[in-house]
Each structure stands twice: as C-alpha cells, then as structure tokens.
Amino acid sequence: MKTNLSSQITLNRVSPRYYRPENAFERSVLTRLEKIPTDIYESAEEGANQIALDIAQLIRDKQKAGRFCVLALAGGNSPRNVYADLVRMHQEEGLSFRNVVIFNLYEYYPLAPNAINSNFNALKEMLIDHVDIDKQNVFTPDSTIAKDAIFEYCRLYEQRIESFGGLDIALLGIGRVGNIGFNEPGSRLNSTTRLILLDNDSRNEASKMFGSIENTPISSITMGVATILSAKKIYLLAWGEEKAQKVKECVEGPVTDTIPASYLQTHNNAHVAIDLSAAANLTRIQRPWLVTSCEWNDKLIRSAIVWLCQLTGKPILKLTNKDYNENGLSELLALFGSAYNVNIKIFNDLQHTITGWPGGKPNADDTYRPERAKPYPKRVVVFSPHPDDDVISMGGTLRRLVEQKHDVHVAYETSGNIAVGDEEVIRFLHFINGFNQIFNNSEDQVINDKYTEIRKYLKEKKDGDMDTRDILTIKGLIRRGEARTACTYNNIPLDHCHFLDLPFYETGKIQKNPISEADVEIVRNLLREVKPHQIFVAGDLADPHGTHRVCTDAVFAAIDLEKEEGAKWLKECRIWMYRGAWAEWEIENIEMAVPISPEELRAKRNSILKHQSQMESAPFLGNDERLFWQRSEDRNRGTAALYDSLGLASYEAMEAFVEYIPL
C-alpha cells in the first residue's frame, strides 16, 4: 500500500539539470545568485537521509578518535526524518551514540517540568529515547529556572558547550520569520545563549504545539547566533513550499538581521538542504531563464509569460519582441518566431482553463473545456480533511455542482475535534443541561453526571492537559452539526454527508499517527459505494506533516489500490485538487478556474460562517490574523484579479483546481 503518493506530485516537472548539475561549471552557473552552498533533493526523505549519513559518519569518525561528537539539535518537523534515519541506523546498523553529546537548541520559558509540549520532549520522542546515548551527555535549557538566575544560567550553558570542545554540528530549521532557533528578526550577529521574548509570528507558529496562542509561552531560552555560528559545520533544513520564500531570502538575499538565517552566509561550512518544494522560489528553479538556457515546456512558458506581464505591467496580448529580448526570454522568440505567436498560445491556454461548468457542460463541445460533457449528471465526491475545508476551499464550486444537478457527496475525513475551544463545549453542555431540565425535569442522570464531570475537568484543566475521550467526542459532535448545517444551506442531502472519522487523527494530540490500512479502507469503501465520476481532494501540499496532506495521501492510496484491481469506475473518473484554506495554486499550474459572481461569493461566505466554532477564538487559526472566510475571499478575488491583469475576462472571484492523474 502506497501511503505517500502526494510526495510524488510534481506540478512543474523541474528539469533535473537545474538542481543536479552534471559538473562544477554548471553548478557555478546555476548557483551564481546563491550565497550559501545549497543542495536540492527531490524529496524531504532523500535530503534527510543524506544529512543523517553525514552525521553518522562524523559520529563514527569521532568514536575511532576517542572523542565526543557534539551536536546542537532543533525540534520541530524539519529534522524529524533525519532523526528517524539515525534511529534506524542505530537499530539496524549498530550506530552507537555513546560518544554523542546533545545540546537542545532552544526551550520555551516558562514551562512546567517534563511538559509534553516542550521542545526537549519532542527531541526525546524523535531521537533520544530510542538510542544508547548517555543521558548525562544530554543538555537542555531549564525552563523552570528563576528569572533572576537566567543570565548566569545562560552563561554556564555556553561554558558547558565549550567544555566539550565546542559544537561539531548544528542542525537547524528555518522559521516563518527567517529565524534560526528563536533568534528572531533583530537578533545580533554576536548574540549568545539568552532569554528572548517571542513575537506574535513565533508564538503563532508555536501555538500548534500548545493548542492556542493563549497557552503558548511568551519567551524562550535559545542559543544565540554567535553560538550557532561557532559550530564547525551547520546544516539548515527546509521542506515544503511554505518555507520557499524564507529560503530564497536566506540563500539569495543580503545578510540582514531581519532574516537571521542569512547570517549563515558568513560561515565557511554552512549547508542548506531543501526539497524541490522549498526550492520553488530560488532563481534556478522559479526563473531558470535568468541564469541558464532552459528546457521549455508548456508550464514553464506560461510561468515566464505571467512573470513578464507582471514585470512590464502589460496584459499578455500587448507583450512585444522588445519585452522578451530585454528580460532574458529571447529563447522563446527563437522557438515561436515572434512575441505574437507566444502570446496567442498562452492566452488561449489560460482562456481554456475558465469554465462555469465544473462538472462539465451537457450537450456542449468539450474539446477545449477542462471537464467532460458526459456523463451527465455526474456522481461527485468532495473530500474535506476537516469539516469546513469543503466550503472554505471550494464553496462556490460545490454550490455550482449542486445547482447544475450533479449528485454531490461530501466526505469529512477527520472529526476536527481538537480544533474546538473548551468554551464551545461548555456552551453546548449548558444547552444539553438546560434541555434536560426543561423537557425531562432533570431526570436523565447520565446528562446530570456528565455535565458535572466535564465542567469540573475543564475548570481544573491545566496547560498541556489532554482532553478526555468524552470531551473530544463532544467537540467532534459540534463540528458534525456545523458541517450538516452548511450542507443543508448548500442543498446537499444529509444522507450525502459522510463522516469518516479516520483513525489516524484520533490521538487527542496535535501530533497524529501515520495513516494505516484502516484509514485507507474507510476511504476505499466510500469510493466503491459511490463510484464517482469526479473526485475533489485537498491539494495543500505545503506541510508534509499536516492533516490535509495525510488525508490526501489516504485518498490517493485508496485510488491506487482500486487502480491495481482494475476498478471500472476509476476509468471514467477525474480527480481535481483544490486549495484555498492556506494558499492558492500558482497560475501556471491552474487547469480549471471556476468564476464566482458577487452573489455566489456571499453564499460561500455564509456557508463558511455556519462553522461557528472556527471563528475568532478557534485554535489553530495559524499566523494569518484574518478569519477563514476573509482569507478565502481575498484569495479568490486575487485569482480573478490576476486573470484580469493578464487580459482575460474580469470576474468577482475564482476558485482554481489542478488535475491529479493517478501514478
């Protein structure tokens, strides 16, 4: 069973010669704008494995010399696969950690001892508890130390690093604001281990571990920039497209305290390891025509023309030969003969992505339409990772499919229970208790007992405490009710609402289990039951460990199994990936764009507002201060404005989709 098919999706088929140059000369040409040696891998797993091999080799070399190997390690998701490979090498290849010394790069402050959401606890779960390291050689900032003792404590932490001969390797991730460790914008080059106040961006990012920003510590004890740069070798890891912009600023931008990771440019043995998604904004990947000759394909040409339009401020059909020649695109003139020929091709390509019939227009010529006319009506399954992703990401298209008489099913893949605040539970408990008092004279003892028990637990609940199974069940019921209300508003029958409650999600914690055969079978059974002609799935591939990606992997794994068995329904099925909750498709990748009128956009907003538990006070709203309906509308309007600026039809908003073809 293949459970990582989403990692094999390559939207732009980047030529290997852009990231795997054949010789040193080609590498120097391609990387001439890059100021830190940067290796690009096809997947996070491949990159992590190479870093793990390098670390393992150093550990062995130090063992032979009878010396310690001193590592500064970060938590978070970026190094997770590196640690997994090191654990595997320990278990299968006998790699010993007896000579390894580990220093935790940072720790939240203040924090209770042994808090489950501490950075040190994450390191223990990912690495330390699974290898034979001497626990006396593991050091972490003390998150309980008295405030008046912090300065001296940080000095001693630095001294302890020096007592082992300094750091051999620092393994870093890059934060959303370009931070390394918790050295945030404004950190000085000569800063050492210290207490630092976390800004809103860092606290928002950390809130994923603590459930809400209110529960997130306001400060951290972190190794300083100078401490990190004292390491003999530094690896900066970044996986996924959400890191792409900060990687570009770190690698290609100037050294600046606004991007602390850029300080690595001053180190003579720093290396950046990224996957293709995180490399997406580097010049040699995003704009290769600026550094080398190109292997042109339709998407790269479309990307180049859109870039040229934005650079010149012209719509497609007004671009001239001069525009191409002056901006590094003369190769396209040689290929097509003139600007006019290129312009017409790309204009028509984009024009053909626009359709008001997302399920196909019946009795119409579908030669240049993104979706087939037949069969009509179609059976459609919309997979929604959380109970509101369907309306946030494709609420306009969903409503259009229903109005055009297609048989629409919505499959809510997870309960979404941990994203409901405790105050919502209390509100519904009051309702249930009041209902019991008014209509049952308080005679239902189960309600009375649960009301008292759950209220008491929530009142005494401390930071880091997990919800009980009863509380998680109530939170799941709240989200089910909201999803049903939204479906009813969009005229989807309630028997077409499927709550899959995939088991991988039900840990009660932010960290989920890997998907299993049980998850895939649940999805597969629904597909066999409905036999859809169209499937819509989440295409948010930015976070390799996010629920959206895991849910999509479950769908793709089920489709792959059906394909292997020769399922007849799959031969007539098209699969479309949507975005919208966290990002939007790049225009060069869009294959279907569904226009939304002002009235339809208002209806979409109303659908999203049915999910009241996900409004202002909801956990996991992310770094974006806008509410989900605001983000969604802004992205949809932005897509329409981009099409308009290129000289295409002007619409109020647009939802965009990319077709997935089973591998």
Spans of features found by a protein language model:
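ATP/nucleoside-binding phosphotransfer catalytic cores, i.e., glycine-rich phosphate-binding loops
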Residues: 2-12, 223-226, 232-330
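N-terminal glycine-/serine-/threonine-rich phosphate-binding loop
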Residues: 2-70, 366-367, 374
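Ligand-binding beta-strand-loop-alpha-helix segment within the catalytic cores
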Residues: 19-35, 95-169
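Glycine-rich N-terminal segment of FAD-binding domains in flavoprotein oxidoreductases
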Residues: 64-92
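Histidine-anchored nucleotide/phosphate-binding helix
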Residues: 82-93, 390-415, 419
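Short, surface-exposed, charged loop/turn segments at secondary-structure junctions
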Residues: 176-198, 251-254, 549-558, 591-596
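Class I SAM-dependent methyltransferase SAM-binding "motif I" and its flanking Rossmann-like core
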Residues: 181-225
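Metal-dependent de-N-acetylase/amidase catalytic core
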Residues: 203-211, 215-220, 312-381, 400-404, ...
